[in-house]
Amino acid sequence: MALSVRILGIDPGLRRMGWGVIRVEGSRLSAIAHGVVTPPTAAPLSERLMHLFNSVGDLVRQHGPDEAAIEEAFMAANAASALKLGHARAAAMLAPARAGLPVAEYAARLVKKSVVGTGAADKAQVAAMVGILLPGTKATADAADALAIAICHAHHRRATSLGSAA
């Protein structure tokens, strides 16, 4: 029987942070859980970041992932928005790192290409493919993106391990 690995995928954001946990057994993928963390919008930035950090820590304790993956920051037209997204990414990355988990980072285009086959896929296409790759999974756009990040990591960790075995 193949070794089972749990991966926590994170789609960072200050308003909505998508998350998803998948199980990988050989080439089989299955969804464990997914959802969205919504920090209080009226709270100061520091409190919203603490909410994200604590929520991801709770997810790590509840679902026991072996590894985590998060979407890389992209260059936004608004520098202030990009900086705040960077803060959210850091808060989300610290919780699994503190628990001793490796945290991988993937560009959005690579995630889309891994799941849909094209880096230019839209959110609806990503969500549709997540539903196909993880049958029975009905996720919101943010949670589907997080599951896609976890799937991307599963594909890349498998390719890396196959490459090292050659």
Swiss-Prot record:
InterPro entries in UniProt: RNaseH-like_sf, RNaseH_sf, X-over_junc_endoDNase_RuvC
Catalytic residues identified in the record: 11, 71, 142
Catalytic activity, EC: 3.1.21.10
Record: residues binding Mg(2+) 1: 11, 142
Positions with a binding annotation for Mg(2+) 2: 71
EC category name: hydrolase
Any GO MF annotation of the entry: magnesium ion binding
One GO-annotated biological process of the protein: DNA repair
Superkingdom: Bacteria
Cofactor: Mg(2+)
Catalysed conversion reaction: Endonucleolytic cleavage at a junction such as a reciprocal single-stranded crossover between two homologous DNA duplexes (Holliday junction)
Cofactor, how bound (note): Binds 2 Mg(2+) ion per subunit.
Classification via NCBIfam families: ruvC
Described function: The RuvA-RuvB-RuvC complex processes Holliday junction (HJ) DNA during genetic recombination and DNA repair. Endonuclease that resolves HJ intermediates. Cleaves cruciform DNA by making single-stranded nicks across the HJ at symmetrical positions within the homologous arms, yielding a 5'-phosphate and a 3'-hydroxyl group; requires a central core of homology in the junction. The consensus cleavage sequence is 5'-(A/T)TT(C/G)-3'. Cleavage occurs on the 3'-side of the TT dinucleotide at the point of strand exchange.
Subunit structure comment from the entry: Homodimer which binds Holliday junction (HJ) DNA. The HJ becomes 2-fold symmetrical on binding to RuvC with unstacked arms; it has a different conformation from HJ DNA in complex with RuvA. In the full resolvosome a probable DNA-RuvA(4)-RuvB(12)-RuvC(2) complex forms which resolves the HJ.
Name listed for the protein in its UniProt record: Crossover junction endodeoxyribonuclease RuvC
Organism of origin: Maricaulis maris (strain MCS10) (Caulobacter maris)
Encoding gene, per UniProt annotation: ruvC
